[in-house]
């Protein structure tokens, strides 16, 4: 019978539990093999002793040094190539620079960070290059010392900041900073007539030859050489930019562009002007030509510019009045162009209130011109305006155009005469007709020659849109439409009658004035409109029914120019009853010119 499953009594417990394992030869061999391969002491599983790093740190340091050295060599090959040395001189390729690996090894031994080591190494390289430059003598470079010139080349090539080296050498040679004599131009394309140049390591023979070669380019030359530095002040006959100046000097002196410092001189610095002036009188400098104006103004006693008095506004107003400059921009620009010849313009440019003087000048000129216009009759005004027209034309072109438009010339002359003389209810002429018939061209040409004003109904929302009528002898409203006719029929009847009206002007109280001669152009024949019947007796109309003729080359068939109107008024002067001014002109009576400045008649110009 089989043994029962499950637990047995306590008495049979010892038989069920295996107390000692059975051993065999195979088991013993595997156990021994396992024990030999994985033998360990459990008591020494954790090692609490201090670890020794060994040479891993030194290995890492050597790897960082190697990488830094490779990066440095790549940068040197990139920025200090043999091609750059060959451009300066072929002899420089045979010159070996002083080794600096020794200092690099010391730096590597003292530093433990690759980044700090590289930065410190580069800083030390720059400082060592600057410190190793030998002191310059105060005597010029002797002839034949080609080795010294070559040394200057190598020193400049070794410098990472060649401009700083040149500035330091310049100050050591001349005792004054280069920036103390010059003002800076950032752009290479900015033109200037005067340039200051400092050239490093110029051969003495080339320096002497440049004194003669530069005379064909410059009005004034100032050259001085001390040790390896040569200083030039060149006043060119024409404005040049920095690139053009460098190209000229590199070809003339056989130098590289890196050897040149160039900036314009300071023009309003007395100390800088005295440096050039005293240097020109010394024996060590070469000068050719008259002193520039900016130097003479600040150094020579009794110079014409130093004798100029303070700015005189009345002289500026007189100049603008004589040249008919009314716009502020024209006055400012044209008067500034007079600065080299006019002492008052120089004083104005040196003043801090230039804009205020320009505004006051423009205002005063407008006041004088308006007063002069009001004093003149229509005959005098027309005579003065046509005398300003240069050239000759023929009045027949205007007469032919009127006949082409089927306008009776006699009737037009009668209406024009009444308008110019401001006859009540006859001082307004309307030119109407289809589009492209030459209405605007005809009236605009007349307004242009008589210096009239043009009014635009687009400004009718402003209560000052009629203000130009108080400042002219003849006015024009071009392309009158229905809204404008309604406005004229409502508000401008008294003005068209030739009576005094109250005209609102900006920045002043309303003034009492009469409307000047008025020209109108429109596509609407107001005489055919019943709604504007009150304007029929106040406006004289002429119709232009035919299209404006053009030549095959797209030029007008009829020349409506200032010269044509000049001939028109001259030819029909008596018919228009404009005889007063012409009679005075034929009598040869002299007229005194208007003077608005405080200058006396006997004062020198």
Curated annotation (Swiss-Prot):
GO biological process: DNA replication
Domain named SF3 helicase: residues: 407-557
Keyword Secreted: no
Sequence motif Nuclear export signal, location on chain: 88-97
Keywords for the protein's UniProt record, in alphabetical order: ATP-binding, DNA replication, DNA-binding, Early protein, Helicase, Host nucleus, Hydrolase, Isomerase, Isopeptide bond, Nucleotide-binding, Phosphoprotein, Ubl conjugation
Modified residues annotated as Phosphoserine in this record: 81, 89
Organism: Human papillomavirus 20
Chief location category: host cell
Pfam short name (any one): PPV_E1_DBD
Protein's UniProt name: Replication protein E1
Changes after translation: Phosphorylated. Sumoylated.
Region (Disordered), start-end ranges: 580-605
Gene3D superfamilies the record matches: 3.40.1310.10, P-loop containing nucleotide triphosphate hydrolases (3.40.50.300), Zinc finger, large T-antigen D1 domain (1.10.10.510)
Substrates-to-products reaction catalysed: Couples ATP hydrolysis with the unwinding of duplex DNA by translocating in the 3'-5' direction; ATP + H2O = ADP + phosphate + H(+)
Region described as DNA-binding region: 145-308
Lineage: superkingdom: Viruses
A GO CC annotation given for this chain: host cell nucleus
